[in-house]
Every structure is written in C-alpha cells, then in structure tokens.
Amino acid sequence: MNSPSPNGAFQKNRGMSPEEGAILKETIEELRSRIGDTFDGITVERVTIGIFFTGVKLSNGSGGLCFTPIKEIPEAVCCPSSLRALPWSGKFRGRPIADFLDALFDRSPMKRAVGIAVVNALSAQFLECNSSPGFVIERGSDALDEIEIPDDGNVVVIGALVPILKRLKMRGKPYSIIEMDPRTLKADELPFWVSVEKTGEVVPRADLLVITGTTLLFHSLEAILACAKPGAKVVLVGPTASMLPDAFFRRGVSVMGGDLVTRPDELLDILCEGGSGYHFFGKSADQMAIRRTEPAS
C-alpha cells in the first residue's frame, strides 16, 4: 500500500498551513507537555523491523507500531545502502527518544518508520483510557468495519484498504481509489483507480474520505487534509496512525483507527518472525477507534 506525495494541487487552504510534518511536530509537543520532566529521560529498549510492521518498546514499558515501508527502499540491497538506510542497526538499545524523534524528518523512510513507532509508543499511555476531552476511544473496534458509507455520497479511498474496498464493491456504486501502485488492486477495483496526479481534483469532491495512515509516514497527510472540503467525513486508519489525535482532529479528521500495543515484548517477538496483524490482534495489541466528540476547531 502506497500513499500519494503532496504536489501543487494540494495547496488549497483549509484553515491551517499544510506544512509537511506539522502534525507530527504538534503531536511531539503535546506529548512533551503531557509527560513533563521525564520526557527527555525516556530511551528505546527494543526495536524490531518486520516485514509488515516496525515495532519499538520504550524504557517506560510502552510499545508502538508503524507500517514498514519496504517498497520505498529498493536500493537497500547491499551493505553500504543498508547502512545508509539504518545506520543504528545493532545500536538501538539505550538511545534517547530524541534521536528517533529527530529522525522523523530524515530522508530515510526506515528511520521515519522507527520514529513514528516511538511517537505511537509515547502516546499509548494516554490512549489506554476510554476517553479524553474532545474524543472517545473504543478498544477492540475496527474503524474500517464501522464506517457509515453514504448510499449516494462520493467516496474516495487513499490507499489499497481492502476492508473498505470490499464494502464499496458490495454497495455497487462508483467510488475512487487513489493508489500509487495499481498492481495492488484487484481486477474489479481497477476501473475505479485514480492516479496520484489527480488527487487534488478528486479529494475535494469526497463526502467520505478514507485515508491510509502511511500518508503520515510520507508527510503527505497535511496537504491531503487541506484539500478536503468542509463537512467531509474523514477517516484515517492503520497502525501508523496510533497516536494522540488532537493535531489530526484540528485538521478535520473525524475518526482514527489504529492499534494499541498491550504486550510489547510478545508483539516484537511476533514481528521478528514475520508476523502481521492476524498474529497479534487481541493478543499483544488491540485495534481501537478514536472518535472526535467536538467540532474541529
């Protein structure tokens, strides 16, 4: 699953600047404020880069996940290239989280993936409760299964999100899929495929906009949200989007569907063995839906 990168068509303003990486920067500041004086003392205890997901465990016991962007690093097939992609391999343990948070804005997608997993791990302690001002959390809930699809509305999906595509096909009406690699789509989905270059034309027409969380990894989410029309229902899903929701909700996101790590060591062991969500959901991580309860500011 790949996600579009921002281009000039995304620069329509929705009340906030679509600065690349702004959501992550705001979320880090929110976490720093909530955690307080102990923030800078937190270190990374374990890192696992699996086939499907990258996971971390922090010194405070929290764990976090991120999508592993394997397709984005085809050059990492020899030792020098691999070293550039992940120069800290073998030296992750004990590093301060500041190193990983700085890497969120590095050119290497693998460094960014580990950094996002750290942000999700830092967020976990605040997402274990059922609610917080401005939002409510539903543990064990798959946001994709519970999306209310408008019968006649215009639906746009960014990324090859299989569960929602199945439901849209059952609806039997046109929809749009924005996906960088159309080879990830099935034959009956290809007629609805839209090239990334047309994202700026298609997104503003969406009544329901469902976005893969990998857009956060590639710093394209802000531009996409800035392009959505006022009043559109926006759903962001995937393990990558498993962090404090405030910065997302301020930009019009209605629901976030992510994963909450409950047993970090067990989860990382599964990732080491090439495991996917089917192997850890309900065991070492729970799916969750984070719903906005107040209007976007």
Task: For each feature predicted by the language model, list its residue ranges.
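Conserved acidic residues
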Residues: G153, D207, S254
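Short acidic low-complexity segments
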Residues: W193-P204
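Structural motif
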Residues: V156, L208-T212, V235
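C-terminal functional extensions of proteins
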Residues: K233-S297
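Residues in the short beta-alpha loop(s) of Rossmann-like NAD(P)-binding domains
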Residues: L161, D181, T240
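Short, conserved loop/helix-junction motifs that constitute active-site signature segments
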Residues: P150, L168-R171, V203-P204, L225-G231
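Electropositive, gly/pro-rich neighborhoods at or near active sites that engage anionic ligands
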Residues: P6-K169, M288-S297
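NAD(P)-binding Rossmann-fold cofactor-contacting core
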Residues: K173-A187
